[in-house]
């Protein structure tokens, strides 16, 4: 089965259940398109939370998985730097309890678990559909750069590798990525690759109205999508 058919299966299931895509589903779709994501598992109970955390390897991150909870931090649904089985058990309990308190009627699927990654340079890649031009892909540096300074670049899909490299060089904060002031430069090629693939995804899956991959951690040798949200 090709990537479009596999992604459609995930999308159709969510549509049939009249709910948004949850983080593990969004990451599964990114994986189908060759966009790197951390290895993850979804634990439905305490035992699985401990087992999967051990398999993935401490320290890990745990986040609530629920179609009704979009802003996980607001719900107290995120725990980072979990170092052992005891902490994993405790984190699972706390997250589930917090989520119940936050939204008593929410459907709680459990938690997504992935390895705590070393801090990279945070960047964002997004996609919106313009009524006139079709799918437009956005690139910017994470945190205040996008939210406050609105330092972003856009291109309409399809996007070539050259377009993607231009998008990256266009933002005012580019020197930070290029290794200004003795900082280590990040892998621009790996970022360009993600931008191109988001463009392909947008063209092949018109059911997805919006994509927000935030943050992507960019390193010297690679780039990895840490969190992802897709709107149908």
UniProtKB/Swiss-Prot annotation:
Known regulation of activity: Activity is dependent on magnesium.
PROSITE patterns registered for this protein in UniProt: ATP_GRASP
Pfam family, one: ATP-grasp_5
Temperature-activity note from the record: Optimum temperature is above 90 degrees Celsius.
KW Transport (keyword) present: no
Keyword Transferase in annotation: no
EC number: 6.2.1.13
Keywords, comma-separated and alphabetical: ATP-binding, Cytoplasm, Ligase, Nucleotide-binding
pH relationship of activity: Optimum pH is 9.0 (at 80 degrees Celsius). Optimum pH is 7.0 (at 55 degrees Celsius).
Amino-acid positions noted as binding ATP in the UniProt annotation, renumbered to this chain: 53-64
GO MF: acetate-CoA ligase (ADP-forming) activity; ATP binding; metal ion binding
Domain ATP-grasp: 27-63
Catalyzed reactions per annotation: acetate + ATP + CoA = acetyl-CoA + ADP + phosphate
Enzyme class: ligase
GO annotation, cellular component aspect: cytoplasm
Main location: cytoplasm
Family, as annotated: Belongs to the acetate CoA ligase beta subunit family.
UniProt xrefs under PANTHER family: 3-HYDROXYPROPIONATE--COA LIGASE [ADP-FORMING], ACETATE--COA LIGASE [ADP-FORMING]
Job of this protein: Catalyzes the reversible formation of acetate and ATP from acetyl-CoA by using ADP and phosphate. Can use other substrates such as isobutyryl-CoA, propionyl-CoA and butyryl-CoA, but not indoleacetyl-CoA, phenylacetyl-CoA or succinyl-CoA. Seems to be involved primarily in the conversion of acetyl-CoA to acetate. Participates in the degradation of branched-chain amino acids via branched-chain-acyl-CoA esters.
Subunit structure and binding partners: Heterotetramer of two alpha and two beta subunits.
Protein name per the record: Acetate--CoA ligase [ADP-forming] I subunit beta
Organism, scientific name: Pyrococcus furiosus (strain ATCC 43587 / DSM 3638 / JCM 8422 / Vc1)
């Amino acid at each position: 089965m090709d990537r479009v058919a596999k992604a459609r299966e995930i999308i159709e299931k969510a549509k049939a259940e009249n709910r948004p895509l949850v983080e593990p589903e969004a990451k599964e779709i990114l994986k189908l398109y060759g966009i790197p994501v951390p290895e993850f598992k979804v634990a439905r109970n305490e035992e699985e939370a401990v087992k999967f955390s051990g398999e993935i390897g401490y320290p890990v991150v745990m986040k609530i998985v629920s179609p009704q909870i979009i802003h996980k931090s607001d719900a107290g649904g995120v725990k980072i730097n979990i170092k052992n089985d005891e902490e994993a058990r405790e984190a699972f309990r706390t997250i589930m309890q917090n989520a119940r308190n936050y939204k008593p009627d929410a459907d709680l699927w459990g938690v997504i678990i992935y390895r705590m990654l070393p801090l990279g340079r945070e960047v964002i890649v997004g996609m919106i559909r313009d009524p006139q031009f079709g799918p437009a892909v956005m690139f910017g540096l994470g945190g205040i750069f996008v939210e406050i300074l609105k330092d972003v670049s856009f291109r309409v899909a399809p996007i070539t590798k050259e377009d993607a490299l231009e998008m990256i060089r266009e933002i005012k904060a580019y020197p930070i990525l290029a290794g200004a002031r003795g900082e280590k430069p990040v892998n621009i090629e790996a970022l360009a690759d993600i931008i191109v693939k988001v463009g392909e995804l947008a063209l092949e899956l018109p059911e997805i109205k919006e994509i927000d991959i935030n943050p992507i951690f960019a390193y010297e040798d690679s780039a990895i999508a840490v969190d992802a949200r897709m709107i149908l």
